[in-house]
């Protein structure tokens, strides 16, 4: 029984098979799936061959993310034996009308875009936590959340306007009001 593979998976496996030959002469890309360094707890590869293998693994992982959401590209690569050519069963299936390529469910695509969007928006907007010597700190730390853009912007305006308020109270020129445009 032949395992059904989509066109994109077949292309990805072909890229794994062919790209390995560009930087290594060992002939078996499966040996390079898992990084094994000489020293047990080494954080970075030290030799040129180890760096090339690490870069190749990174590229294959990124290519896998383009067409599959399983987050386990190594198991996906080792899931079935593949020799770089289509088998007879697959070629006969394609001539008789192969099943269409599996589509990613819409909710997975929406979830991925939503996560990327919110990560980009909220990346630097997390407010500073209250000081630890504040009375009732233990209650404040539980409810501490992300600040919205409007809250953060109002805080910035408030701290920026403090010197102007002092000048105005002393009889100086009233501070200019900023045009507030919220995105």
Swiss-Prot record:
It holds the Pfam family TT_ORF2-like. It comes from the Viruses. Belongs to the herpesviridae US1 family. This is Uncharacterized protein HHRF7. It comes from Human cytomegalovirus (strain AD169) (HHV-5). The lineage of its organism: Viruses, Duplodnaviria, Heunggongvirae, Peploviricota, Herviviricetes. The gene is US32.
